[in-house]
C-alpha cells in the first residue's frame, strides 16, 4: 500500500471516531451520566438539566420571560414567545426540529406510533430498520410481538467504568456506580434526575477500540 493511501485511511478513521462514536472518557456526558438500556447508550441528566440530544444536557429554563426564549425548557424542547395571545406575551415550550409532542414529552418524529412496551423507541439514523425499540434491563425484543420489549431476558452491560466503579443495574437501566447506589426513578432518556452516588460518565464502545487498534497499526506502518 502506498503512503498517501495510508494517510487517507488515517484521516478517514479519525473523522469517523469524532462524528459517530459514542461518548468515552474523553467525551463525557456533561451535567449528567451515561446509562445503558438493551440496545443503546445515552445521557441521563442531573436535576435542573434537560437533554438537547442523546449525549448533551443543558440547564433547564423556566420559559417565563424573553430571556428564556430559544433556550432549553424540557427534554428536546426550546422556549418560544407567542406575543399575540391574549394581547400579551406568552411563552411556551416547543419540541425541537425532528421531534414531536407525545403526551407530555417530545419524542423523535420517526418514533411516532412506534409502540415498545417496557422500553423506549430510538432512532439513530444508522439502524437499517429505522426506529427501533431499546428495552428496560430485564426485558428483550420479542420477535413474536412486533419487536416490542415484552419478553423476559438478560442484557450484558457494555459500559466501561472508571477505576473504582462498576456497572450496576439502577432501576431499569445500567450505569457506573457503587453496589449500594439506591434505586432511581425513570428509565431511558428522561431528564430531571440526580445521579446516584458515585455515578460514572465513561464508556468505550467496541467500535472505538477497533479504530484505536487500526490507527496504531497505520502509524507503525508509516
Curated annotation (Swiss-Prot):
Name its cellular compartments.
Answer: Cell membrane
Per UniProt, which keywords does this protein have? Cell membrane, Disulfide bond, EGF-like domain, Glycoprotein, GPI-anchor, Lipoprotein, Malaria, Membrane, Repeat, Signal
Please give the sites of covalent lipid attachment annotated as GPI-anchor amidated glycine: 200
Q: Where is the EGF-like domain?
A: 29-58, 59-107, 107-150, 151-176
Is Cell membrane included in the keywords of this UniProt record? Answer: yes
Q: One GO term of the cellular component aspect?
A: plasma membrane
Gene3D superfamilies given for it? Plasmodium vivax P25 domain
InterPro entries per UniProt: EGF-like_dom
Q: Glycans attached where?
A: 87
Please give, as recorded in its UniProt entry, the membrane topology of this protein. Lipid-anchor; GPI-anchor
Q: Which domain of life is it from?
A: Eukaryota
Note the SS bond partners.
Answer: 63-79, 73-93, 95-106, 111-121, 116-133, 135-149
Propeptide intervals in chain numbering: 201-222
* Keyword Repeat in annotation: yes
Q: Where is the signal peptide?
A: 1-21
Report the protein name in the record. Answer: 28 kDa ookinete surface antigen
Query: Can you name the source organism?
Result: Plasmodium gallinaceum
